[in-house]
UniProtKB/Swiss-Prot annotation:
Source organism: Saccharomyces cerevisiae (strain ATCC 204508 / S288c) (Baker's yeast)
Protein's name in the database: Protein HMF1
Sequence position, cross-link Glycyl lysine isopeptide (Lys-Gly) (interchain with G-Cter in ubiquitin): K52
Family designation: Belongs to the RutC family.
The gene coding this protein: HMF1
Note: Present with 672 molecules/cell in log phase SD medium.
Length: 129
């Protein structure tokens, strides 16, 4: 089997803040770069953790759609929180999108995240057939 590597740049997600693609396709798997609470026009989301989580998941959804996938094709999620006390509020939003389909997941507290944001989420998904 030949391994095909295809970078994905998504116009409806925030521009990359460094040297990376929004996602990388490897055959039929899609590895998404971490998304933070920034709008597609590169504005930091202010407000509650729930507001920020909504934007992060929307960014993930947009990159998945640009990659020929969707939230229901996600197989693994990694979540990074700057404050573990935000775990419950983040989960209340996460559960709206992943209620029946529940991918494997890790959630860890970290000392700091880029641009001083509260959270970051990355995912691995399968491409649509």
């Amino acid at each position: 089997m030949v391994t095909t590597l295809t970078p994905v740049i998504c116009e409806s997600a925030p521009a990359a803040a460094a040297s990376y693609s929004h996602a990388m396709k490897v055959n039929n798997l899609i590895f998404l770069s971490g998304q933070i609470p920034v709008t597609p026009d590169n504005k930091l989301v202010e407000g509650s953790i729930a507001d920020k989580a909504e934007q992060v998941i929307q960014n993930i959804k947009n990159v998945l759609e640009a990659s020929n996938s969707s939230l229901d094709r996600v197989v693994k999620v990694n979540i990074f929180l700057a404050d573990i006390n935000h775990f419950a509020e983040f989960n209340s939003v996460y559960a709206k999108y992943f209620n029946t389909h529940k991918p494997a997941r890790s959630c860890v507290a970290v000392a700091a995240l880029p641009l001083g944001v509260d959270m970051e989420m990355e995912a691995i998904a399968a491409e649509r057939d």
